[in-house]
Amino acid sequence: EVDTFEALDHAKTHYPIDEDRICVRGFSMGGAATWHQAVHHADIWVAANAGAGFAETAVYQNVFSKEPHPPTWEQKLWNLYDATVCAGNLHQCPAIAYSGEIDKQMQASDIMAEFMAKEGLELPHVIGPGMGHKFHPDSKIEIEDWLKTVVAKGRNKNPEQIRFTTYTLRYNRMHWLTIDGLEEHWQRAQLDADVIDKSKLQITTQNITRFSIDLQQCPLNSDNEESITIDGQHLAVSTHYVKSNGAWASCTETDNSS
């Protein structure tokens, strides 16, 4: 992913690029990279298009059909890369998948569709008739038409709703929210936010001890003393929040020691 961002930054120095209309796309190994980039950096793309490739470790590699099974600590570390466990982040990034009809790597699209469905998302899946590990010409047209519609709208940089899943502070930001501390690393952390009528912000957390709000980007237009609710607790507007003894409080700065 570092190579991707370095290449993108370099391209921006040579071409006029609209940062609100950048798609992440790839096929085969590029399809695997696309799923990874799409879920872990969902807030920077206007859309994602993955073809074939893989989206997780265990099923794709048929890991548990062999003995001995990987130790639990190794399985936890799959959460650094696996796209399936963070499929809910695609609430922030519309995605479309492609598979050849007889390509065994259709498995990646199928399992992403399964995990996205658990998050209330539906994955459009274009299947190339009679195709193995390659694109069908008609499928290209169908995908391009879908992308043109999404790209025309542009990226929503200031969403009123955020659904953010992570397992590590390596991927700790989604739009105007940043997770600064976890109760237990490599376990699922969830930070969901809803701005209601521009005047109230409701936040729910799981496995999080600290987080920050970018008030310049958050579409909240209120400084009411109790316009923010965190896990049912009413609090004044602030940039940083910390959880201690089960209760949330505002703080002046973040402490990444958590």
Predicted segment positions?
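Hydrolases whose catalytic domains are alpha/beta-hydrolase-1, hotdog thioesterase
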Residues: 33-37
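Catalytic His-Asp charge-relay segment
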Residues: 92-99, 124-125
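Mobile cap/lid helix-loop segments that gate and shape the active-site cleft of serine hydrolases
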Residues: 43-93
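Alpha/beta-hydrolase-fold serine-hydrolase catalytic core, especially in secreted/extracellular enzymes
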Residues: 114, 118-258
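Short beta-strand immediately N-terminal to the catalytic nucleophile in serine-hydrolase-like folds
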Residues: 24-26, 49-51, 98
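Gly/Ser-rich "nucleophile elbow"/oxyanion-hole loop immediately N-terminal to the catalytic nucleophile
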Residues: 1-29, 39-45, 89
